[in-house]
Amino acid sequence: MIKDEFLIKSWYIPLDFFSADDEGRTELPTDQKKQKAREEGRVLKSTEINTAVSLLLLFALFFFMLSYFALDLIAVFKEQAIKLPEVMRMSVYTMGFAYIRSIMGYVVLFFFASLAVNFFVNIIQVGFFITFKSLEPRWDKISFNFSRWAKNSFFSAGAFFNLFKSLLKVVIICLIYYFIIENNIGKISKLSEYTLQSGISIVLVIAYKICFFSVMFLAIVGVFDYLFQRSQYIESLKMTKEEVKQERKEMEGDPLLRSRIKERMRVILSTNLRVAIPQADVVITNPEHFAVAIKWDSETMLAPKVLAKGQDEIALTIKKIARENNVPLMENKLLARALYANVKVNEEIPREYWEIVSKILVRVYSITKKFN
């Protein structure tokens, strides 16, 4: 009985071993969270896309350089064939150095080309940025947690996906090699019967097919890998509701302070409106959602001017102040909306609105005159 209890306790695995580390992180990451992760060196990146694009460009460069490379080797061979008596007295190292010297230029060029290709492919995928934060020691990560390590190493979706991806690449690329070689086995077995030029052409065509289909397959793998890495990246940056609230609070400031600033702005706006509205000749309304105060003075203005405008709550304030100061209210839904959208405060009204505004002003003046 004691032995059974000991075994149960020894092999007991808590259920939270299989639960998500980020339990409760249900909110999508904000732009600020993504920017912070980028500054730390955590970016969305697919190594498979890098590999596929780099191999495609490097294979293209290789096959382009191949003809020039072959011509240089043939030139060295011809030079040594012409000077055969001298060559016979040379050491093997001296003879080989002539070939190495002609090859090294292409090797160096290919090396720097591969560095440039990888550099630019990475820039295209993640953009250009330099950060050293990922190299800084994270002392909070030193504490070893076997359950977390085992889960991330053996039971995570990333581990299974990478294992499946690696096995799939090995199997498919081996099958590509097998089928291409099998389809050309007749030509390969008779290479000794062809001329040197024909034999090289056959080998190059076979190599080209293998490279092309392998790169195409890696490109397809890269697309799926990018989609998977994107989902994992978003998942790793997900936030709790509390983190989102805290971030919004940091960005927008303390709610109490924000409400005080808003109230202060409302007081300032109301003060400005109480100065501007009494000077207006008419307030054009929507009637509920928009209000635009207009003034016209033929001696100082070339066209009527917008003194104040507002929407919703501000529109109600404008109408209230207008009533208190006996400024006429005229309802014209289309005009009120158009002036609110297209004319700024203290700007003159555009020419296309002159006719309709003049009619409203004439009507206002006639009513005011009759009232007086």
Curated annotation (Swiss-Prot):
Highest taxon of the lineage: Bacteria
Tell me how this protein sits in the membrane. Multi-pass membrane protein
Cite a GO CC annotation: plasma membrane
Does the record carry Cell wall biogenesis/degradation as a key word? no
Q: Name one GO biological process term.
A: protein secretion
Question: Where are the bilayer-spanning segments?
Answer: 57-77, 104-124, 161-181, 202-222
> Do you know which InterPro entries this protein is assigned to?
FlhB (IPR006136), T3SS_substrate_exporter (IPR006135), T3SS_substrate_exporter_C (IPR029025)
Major subcellular site: membrane
Tell me which stretches of the chain form a coiled coil.
none
Q: Where in or outside the cell is it found? A: Cell inner membrane
Sorted alphabetically, the keyword list is: Bacterial flagellum biogenesis, Bacterial flagellum protein export, Cell inner membrane, Cell membrane, Membrane, Protein transport, Transmembrane, Transmembrane helix, Transport
What function does the entry list? Required for formation of the rod structure in the basal body of the flagellar apparatus. Together with FliI and FliH, may constitute the export apparatus of flagellin.
Q: Which family does it belong to?
A: Belongs to the type III secretion exporter family.
- Protein name in the entry: Flagellar biosynthetic protein FlhB
Q: What is the species of this protein?
A: Borreliella burgdorferi (strain ATCC 35210 / DSM 4680 / CIP 102532 / B31) (Borrelia burgdorferi)
